[in-house]
Amino acid sequence: MQTNAQGIEHISLITTPVILLKGDKVISQGTGFFYVLEDSTKKNIIFLITNYHVLTGNAPKANKLPKGDNIKFYFHKDPNNPGEVNEIRIPIFTKENKEVWIVSKDYPEADVAAIPILSSFTKGASVYAITENWTKSNMKIRPTSAITLVGYPYGFFDKKNWLPIWKTGTIATEPLYNFEGKPLILIDISAFPGMSGSPAFAIANGAYQTIDGPTTVGQVRMFLGIYASMQMVTEAKYLEELVQKESKKGIKISSSLELGHIWKADLIVNMTKNIDVKKYEEEIVKKLF
């Protein structure tokens, strides 16, 4: 379940670079991953999950036009030969100028977006993904528990084998509570541009404490959410000048607290469950190309 025949972690095969373009010009690059909604009435829909700002170049609720008009991402052709991939390129608007992504109706400020993937895009590919079951584990997580992001910092990764980078930090807030009333966990980590959209996991290889208290032994991969951004603080720096009268001229400097924002997995589960598949097919899919 966790590795393929070549010993590659399942998680390494669910991620993809997500590149925003305007025409053929690259605007920016982030990370995305594949999530499957297991629902007999919805035919196990595959979603590309990433950040809103990765798809548009803007923050949620910024009321700005997207900086690009199409994206590209990748599927592995053969997990036993991960260097072979299929490139997929899609517009982010239909011919009638409707966006192809969905967002959370409950938290429109959440920097999360999902795109249902057409079945034609997965032909000739081996699609690896995570499901809601990955959010369910008896592993106890708490502040200081390890958390791992998987993605493409500054677009850096193993391009020969088309495999991502794993970066590990620790949980910095109480994970069972919503930080500032939003479905967020803060993490202590050194993360960089390009990691936006990375899936976040709590991982155990061996002994771990269960939520009931006892320690057990096993292998756990628990999906916690999606990395979005770092927490910044802004402070004023003044240059003292003596002219005819005292004055202050200054600049503002932004500093990172080395705290990252993780939008919780439940947010993704709920927003994908709430999609009206028939309406999406009629309004988006049939008018995409």
Regions found by a protein language model. Give the residues of each.
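A conserved glycine-rich beta-strand in the N-terminal activation segment of trypsin-fold
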Residues: 25-46
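C-terminal subregion of chymotrypsin/trypsin-like serine protease catalytic domains
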Residues: 8-11, 48, 202-289
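Serine endopeptidase catalytic core focused on the charge-relay Asp
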Residues: 10-16, 20, 28-29, 38, ...
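Short aromatic-glycine-enriched beta-strand elements
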Residues: 44-46, 185, 224
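N-terminal positively charged helical leader segments and presequences
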Residues: 55-58
